[in-house]
Design a protein with these regions (language model features):
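Residue(s) in the substrate-gating loop at a strand-loop-helix junction
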Residues: 134
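The beta1-alpha1 cofactor-binding region of Rossmann-like NAD(H)/NADP(H)-dependent oxidoreductases
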Residues: 54-65, 96, 209-211
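Substrate-binding pocket helix/loop in short-chain dehydrogenase/reductase
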Residues: 90-91, 95-103, 185, 197
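Alpha-helical segment proximal to the catalytic Tyr-Lys
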Residues: 119, 163-164, 225
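Conserved glycine-rich cofactor-binding loop
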Residues: 11-12
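Active-site helix of classical SDR
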Residues: 114, 150, 158
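Short, small/polar-rich loop/turn modules that mediate ligand/substrate recognition or access, typified
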Residues: 166, 171, 227-229, 235
Length: 241
């Protein structure tokens, strides 16, 4: 896979795994991050993956950031919209700023990045755009009206955008993970994990971040060229559509 890939939120959690698996598959990867310079530089030193700091929720920042990626590495063939945040609260307690922040980072970001790579993909006649959604965008989650709305919106974005790009050699798909063994999930008390979370998952375990990464690698491959507008659920059978 001699392609150039940009992974947003690509230095931590699921994004880190996606970056690593894409690199293992032969892609040249650029990993975007938002804030933690020390962690990003440590990731770069450990993995030899280039890192690029910009706010995916800001269109102009994306324009400048993607221009730098393409100047430093080359035209982007694969875009993985993975960046995401949570600001949880029931709606009756939710601050407007927390709604806006989650929508900006989890949904508007997909427009901001895609708009800045799509012209080049159309000119070259090839592109792979993979949007990382969530099981909570499919089934909803208490206290996550903002997050669930953003991730559900990402699925609609995927389907509509896929229709617009299908004739140009560009595919647009989504991956919706369930409970994945990231630092955040592994911080849950073991008793809660064993009694409240694992019983919800028919396969009886958490997903591994690299399993999500392998979904992305497949959808980014030449072999997946007949798949577009699809949502690939990676949730151990917790939610089936």
């Amino acid at each position: 896979m001699a392609r150039i890939a940009l992974v947003t939120g690509g230095t931590r959690g699921i994004g880190r795994a996606i970056s690593l698996v894409l690199k293992e598959a032969g892609a040249r990867v650029a990993a975007n991050y938002a804030a933690n310079d020390d962690a990003a530089n440590a990731f770069k030193d450990e993995t030899a993956i280039e890192v690029f700091k910009f706010d995916v929720g800001d269109f102009d920042a994306c324009k400048d950031g993607i221009s730098k990626v393409e100047a430093d590495i080359g035209p982007i063939d694969i875009l993985v919209n993975n960046a995401g945040i949570t600001r949880d609260n029931p709606l009756h307690k939710m601050d407007p700023e927390h709604w806006d922040a989650v929508i900006a980072t989890n949904l508007s970001s997909a427009f901001n990045t895609s708009r800045n790579v799509i012209d080049g993909m159309r000119e070259r006649g090839f592109g792979r755009i993979i949007n990382i959604g969530s099981i909570n965008g499919q089934k909803g989650q208490f206290g996550q009206v903002n997050y669930s709305a953003a991730k559900a919106g990402l699925i609609g974005f995927t389907k509509a955008f896929a229709l617009e790009t299908a004739s140009k050699g560009i595919t647009v798909n989504a991956v919706t993970p369930g409970y994945i063994a990231t630092e955040m999930v592994m911080a849950v008390p073991e008793e809660v994990l064993n009694t409240k979370i694992l019983p919800l998952i028919p396969v009886g375990r958490l997903g591994e971040p690299k399993e999500v990464g392998r979904c992305v690698v497949f959808l980014a491959s030449d072999e997946a060229g007949f798949i577009t507008g699809s949502t690939l659920s990676a949730n151990g059978g917790q939610y089936m559509t």
